[in-house]
Amino acid sequence: TTYNLARMNMILRGIPYRNFNIYNGDTLEHDYFGDKKFRVQVANPPYSANWSADMKFMEDARFNEYGKLAPKSKADFAFVQHMVYHMDEDGRAVVLLPHGVLFRGAAEEVIRKHLIQKLNVLDAVIGLPANLFFGTGIPVCVLVLKRERNGNADNILFIDASKDFEAGKNQNILRQSDIDKIVDAYQRREDIDKYAHVATMQEIEENGFNLNIPRYVDTFEPEEEIDLNEVAADIRKLQSEIKDIDAELKP
């Protein structure tokens, strides 16, 4: 079904069938592309899907350098490893994933640390609003991966775009203005109050390679300060008014 929907989507967008190749298969279990490398990859894989995590993959070039495989019940990082392997020397990749990949421990922590510390391919983490996609209401994040980081090798950009959307009847919608704001923040690559932060590798390491966005982008809105003297005066005034009313009601 997904295969046919993908083909229909291309045709409806006016792309001739001779100009695209769509294959239906399990890309983790059977790597159709072999050693082929790509300059650009975009993916929205099934979130926290099951996969075999067979030990044979420890000899697979896509996974063996990490020393760990993604858990059987959460193939998220397996898709990331697959994409990183197929990036060419100037390759870029963008992948949508659940937020759990940013902070879950055990094998996923090992893989995350390797991507950051050894390969240094993670360029940005972007948090999106909840309920953007059919079939799931969970908020997702975008991982931007780049083989050549062009002067940004000592930092990772975090963007919290989770509050910018238009609420729809069945799902939320990213407006063009919301998309433009994300793109502008990514291109500027600087701290923006309550929206974006450029985290140094030292910060990342001090946080134990935990990439949970609230650790880096503070969106906390302080509560309005309460003037206790003013509150006390209001209470005294009310008490006086109540006393006057009681006096009027007495026979």
Language model region names:
Residues T1-K36:
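S-adenosyl-L-methionine
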Residues D31, D35-P251:
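A conserved structural/catalytic subdomain of Rossmann-like adenosyl-cofactor enzymes
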